[in-house]
C-alpha cells in the first residue's frame, strides 16, 4: 500500500481510551467486578428509543430499534443484582472509581469539575438493560505534553453487558460485566500520523496501568478512533483492542476516505446526479433468468425459496469496483456492508467483479438486457427472501446516493486486518440527558487528597529512579517506551534485588529483540511467561544467562510448553558443573600450557557450549580460573 502524504491530506485523529478500573465493586452497586458465568435465571427485553429533553430521537438509537431484536440477559448470582436488571435504582457512585479518575486528571493537568453530574447516554443495542449507559465527566482539558496532544474530557462510566451470542432476531448478554467502572479519556483531534496515534494510545495506556488500579487482559481496554481528512467528515471507529492495529486502521481509513472523495469527483465528471440515479433506478426480479445457474450462492438462495433481484446502477461502471483500500475493500464492499447491517442480507454481487462466482458472461448479458443497462452502467445482483430484498433495494439506492456527498457520517467497527466495516449511523446530540436517580457529587478536598495517592509517576522521575536501580540511560529510556513498562515495575517490586532490575529490563526489551532476530515468534510470549522466567531465576531454578536460549527454543517450536523448556535448562548442581570444567581442562592440557594466561578464554568458550546457559557465566569463570591456577603451578 502506497503511503499517503498525511499533511497534505489534512489527517486528524482523536482517541477515546476506555479502560476498566480494578475496584472492589461496580460503579453503581456493591456487586463484584469479576466475570463469572454462575447464572440460573434469564430475563428478556425489547428496547425502544426515548425522546431527548428537546423532543428529538437519536438516529443511532432509531437504527438499532428498527432491527426489532429481542435481548436475553443471563443473571449471574454473585456478580449482578437488581440494579443490573434495572429493577432497582442505582446506588451512589463508586468513590474508589472517582479517586482513580481524579488521579489521572491530575497527572494530565486537566481541570477537575466542581461537581460531578451523572448523565444517561442512549444505547439500545441491548448492551444495557436500561436502554442507556450512565456516564459522568470528571475533568476537562489537559495535555499529553511530549506529543502535543490535548485532552478534551475525562469521564467515568459503566461498562456494557458482555455479548454471549447473536442470531438474526435475538442477542444474548451476560450481566457480569455490566456496571464495571470504566475511565474514558478523550483526546482532541491533534494526532497527525498513524504512528503518533499508536504512541499516544500506548502512553495513555501506560499512564493508566501505572496507577496500579486498572484491570489487565483481553477486553479490559478498548480504543475508539475518530478520523477525518480535509473535505470529509469525522468517522468513528469502535472497538480496537490491539494496540498494534492502530497504525493500520488509521492508514486504511485515511485511504478509504480519500478514495470516497475521488469517487465523488468522478461522479461529477461523468455528469451524474442524484436525480439521474433515481430516475434511472431499475429493479427487476431475475429469479427465472438464474434458475439453471452454476453460481452456488445464487442456486442455494433460490433452493431455499429466495428470489434474485437485479438493480441497474446508472453510469456506475468502474465505480462499484473502485478500490478504496487496495486488495481489501471496494465501493461495492461498502454497499454490501450497508445491506448486511440494515437488511441483514449477504449474497451481493456487482458487475465490476463479474464474471466470477459461477456467474457466466451469457448470464451477465441477459442481466444487462433485462435491466436495460448500457455499457456505461453497472448493476447489482442480490439474493434472499422478498421482504429483505425490498429493504435491501432501498439500502442500495440510499448508499449510492450518499456517494455524491463523499464520506457519509458513520460509526464503523474495527476488523482484525486493520480495515473497518459499517456498524450504524453516528449518534446525534439527542443522545444524552440527565440521570435523575443519582444526586450530584461535589469534589471536596478530602476526595482530591485521597486521589493523589494514585497519581502515577512522571517519565522524568522514572528515568532518574531507574538509573539509580542500575539501568543505563539507554536501557531506562527503552523500558519507559516499552508497552510492558508496568510489568517491569511489578517484577522489580516482586523479585529485586535478588534478580537485578537490569536483568528484568533487558529480558523485556533486548532479549525479545534478540529472539525475534533469530526467527522466534515473540507473539507467543505473554506477560505470564516473562514473570515465570524471572521467578525461576529468583528461585535459583535457572541462570539469568539461560533466559535468551529458553525463549528462543520456546518461540521456535510450536508444540512446546515454557515450563518444559525451563525444566530442560534448570541450573546445574555445582558438582556437575565442576566435573564439566575438569573434563574440558583435562582434554585441553597441551593447549592450556601453550597459551598460559590466555587459556581462560578457550576453556570458557568450550565450557559455555556444553553448559548452554545452565550456569552463571560469572560462576563458571571463577571456577575455571581457580582450576587453571592449579594446573599451571
Curated annotation (Swiss-Prot):
Quote the EC number: 6.3.5.-
- What chemistry does it catalyse, as a reaction equation? L-glutamyl-tRNA(Gln) + L-glutamine + ATP + H2O = L-glutaminyl-tRNA(Gln) + L-glutamate + ADP + phosphate + H(+)
Source organism per entry reads Saccharolobus islandicus (strain L.S.2.15 / Lassen #1) (Sulfolobus islandicus)
NCBIfam families, sorted: gatE_arch, PRK04028.1
Q: Which GO terms describe its biological process?
A: glutaminyl-tRNAGln biosynthesis via transamidation; translation
Q: What is the lineage of its organism?
A: Archaea, Thermoproteota, Thermoprotei, Sulfolobales, Sulfolobaceae
Q: Does the keyword Acyltransferase apply?
A: no
Molecular function in Gene Ontology: aminoacyl-tRNA ligase activity; ATP binding; glutaminyl-tRNA synthase (glutamine-hydrolyzing) activity
A single GO CC term for this protein reads: cytoplasm
Name assigned to this protein: Glutamyl-tRNA(Gln) amidotransferase subunit E
